Amino acid sequence: MHRSSGVRKKGTFQGIEQKIPYFQELGVTGILLMPAYEYQEIVKSKTRQGKYPQAEEERREEKTKINVWGYTGEAFYYVPKAGFSGTQNPVQEFCHMVNALHEAGLECLMEFYFDHTMEPAKMLDIVRYWKLKYHVDGFRIIGNVCQELFLKDPLLAETKLLFGFLDGERIYGNKEPDYKNGAEYNEGFYYGMRHMLKGDENTAEEIFVPQQEKSQTVRGH
């Protein structure tokens, strides 16, 4: 966070709370947090074994990378990330932030990344937990997940659920959905504007062609 932000607790839940007046000035109705649960920051790549026994001495040394984004299956999904807390109690600090957002008329949404190794029932359990424990208003769910499991869950009936691609036709057919809480998180406009601001070529179509039309083209409909 830039020093001009005026935030004392940069990179923390308290810091977000300090920016609430700014969010209100922007006129937004809520904020979407990237993964803010506890996840593994240290990513170690596997060592490459030599093709022949005598080449083992020459194998690459293990490289260590830092994961600052949180999009990994190596996570402890039930607790707020301690590294984003300005106090010794990240749970209390996160809850205080959510309450402050609600008092200001703002919603708090979160991104959750699930990899292919996780059981669908556990994914649902995690999202339910954050809804009940932390009063999160919505979730952007990333990964190969069973959308129907979330969209038809009564506990999440009034919870915003965002997916990269929402297959409403398959899930609902010609019927009216019981809970109108699902939406497609389409990043086309976001990336189009980013490319235009960078001065990239051929960005006009990327921005002005309706996103729905492009999505249907990608899906082959």
Regions found by a protein language model. Name each.
Residues 1-20:
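Glycine-rich adenosyl-nucleotide cofactor-binding module
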Residues 5-11, 43-103, 116-134:
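Aromatic- and acidic-residue-enriched carbohydrate-binding clefts of CAZyme catalytic domains
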Residues 16-37, 133:
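Catalytic domains of carbohydrate-active enzymes, especially glycoside hydrolases
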Residues 21-24, 95-104, 150-155:
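Surface-exposed amphipathic alpha-helices with a cationic face
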Residues 31-33, 108-110, 139, 161-163:
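Hydrophobic faces of well-ordered beta-strands that scaffold small-molecule active sites
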Residues 35, 41-48, 173-174:
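Short, solvent-exposed loop/turn and secondary-structure capping segments
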Residues 37-39, 112-116, 145, 167:
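Active-site-proximal loop/turn and secondary-structure-junction residues that shape catalytic pockets
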Residues 147, 151-221:
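Conserved alpha/beta catalytic core and glycan-binding cleft of carbohydrate-active enzymes
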